From Swiss-Prot:
Family membership: Belongs to the GHMP kinase family. IspE subfamily.
Task of the protein: Catalyzes the phosphorylation of the position 2 hydroxy group of 4-diphosphocytidyl-2C-methyl-D-erythritol.
Catalytic machinery residues: K14, D141
Catalytic activity reported: 4-CDP-2-C-methyl-D-erythritol + ATP = 4-CDP-2-C-methyl-D-erythritol 2-phosphate + ADP + H(+)
Protein name per its UniProtKB record: 4-diphosphocytidyl-2-C-methyl-D-erythritol kinase
EC assignment: 2.7.1.148
Length: 297
């Protein structure tokens, strides 16, 4: 019998269009409310079925991935193997193009891609409770990345409500400075059981636009919320402020803010040509930065 062909999945970049921190729970985790979209830039994960679990990493940003044992692809696969008896495994190959520790869920998207590949190989549903539990145990952003579709995300990241986003022209910029999520939450400074000031307005999230709403409709509502991690992240890495300034000064920009815990920032535009023109200017002005022009959806 011929060997099973390789399976391929993309790990699309996650972008937090808004991110409100409700507070820090007694167990130390933070309750969040976030509108999450996904970009058209992605890592690529391949699975060669059969044999023991392996991971090889290549690509322009492979060196930033660190040790294989610490990679979330490896962690997710091992946890699923513990949860599902006789799980078929294989050799993963990761083509890494997204920045690491960048606020766009690159590692989480890769882990989610690994779970989707293993689900395909083992005829598991993405709604399988074992897979869902493993996704959350791997990382707070992995559940939303598992489905890779726009959602209103609450709790620590496990409560997902699908949203109908229009295709939004965007520019994403990372200054090639890693920012550790734990450091940003530490800088936020909430004690266990403490609510963020103003959090009462977060608990009842805005009424998000319905299917068919325009980019302008979404921008209008998104302007009423924010990313509560932006200020503490900028205290850690002030260059984030420079990135936001470059985006906000670009022609045609509708909204610009930081994604996740940084340092990647994004801007939304009314037309693809505006996004591409803005990206070209930022590349010229800041040749050391990572810049992507594309769409969010």
């Amino acid at each position: 019998m011929s060997p099973m062909p390789a399976l391929i999945e993309e790990g699309r970049a996650k972008v937090n269009l808004s991110l409100r921190v409700v507070g820090r729970r007694a167990d130390g985790y933070h309750d969040l409310e976030s509108v999450v979209a996904f970009a058209d830039c992605a890592d690529r994960l391949t699975l060669e079925p059969g044999g023991e679990l392996k991971l090889a990493t290549t690509g322009p940003l492979a060196a930033a991935c660190g040790d294989t044992a610490d990679n979330l692809v490896f962690k997710a696969a091992k946890l699923l193997a513990e949860a599902v008896p006789n799980l078929k495994l294989g050799a993963f190959a990761l083509d890494k193009v997204l920045p690491v520790a960048a606020g766009i869920g690159g590692g989480s998207a890769d882990a989610a891609a690994a779970l989707r590949l293993l689900a395909r190989l083992n005829n598991l549903s993405l709604d399988d409770p074992r897979l869902q539990k493993v996704a959350l145990a791997t990382g707070a952003d992995v559940p939303v990345c598992l489905y890779s579709r726009a959602c209103d995300m609450t709790g620590v990241g496990e409560q997902l409500l699908p949203l109908a986003l229009p295709s939004m022209p965007c520019v994403m910029v990372n200054p090639r400075v890693p920012v550790a999520t734990k450091d940003v939450f530490q800088a936020l400074g909430l004690r266990n059981g403490e609510l963020l000031v103003g959090a009462t307005s977060v608990i009842g999230a805005p009424a998000w636009p319905e299917e068919g709403a325009s980019i302008a409709d979404w921008v209008e509502v998104l302007e009423t919320v924010a990313n509560d991690l932006e200020a503490p992240a900028m205290r850690i890495e002030p260059v984030i402020g420079e990135v936001l300034e470059a985006l906000r000064d670009s022609a045609g920009v509708k909204l610009a803010r930081m994604s996740g815990s940084g340092a990647t920032c994004f801007a939304i535009y009314g037309a693809p040509a505006e996004a591409h023109a803005a990206a070209e200017k930022i590349r010229r002005d800041h040749p050391g930065w990572w810049v992507h022009a594309g769409t969010l959806s």
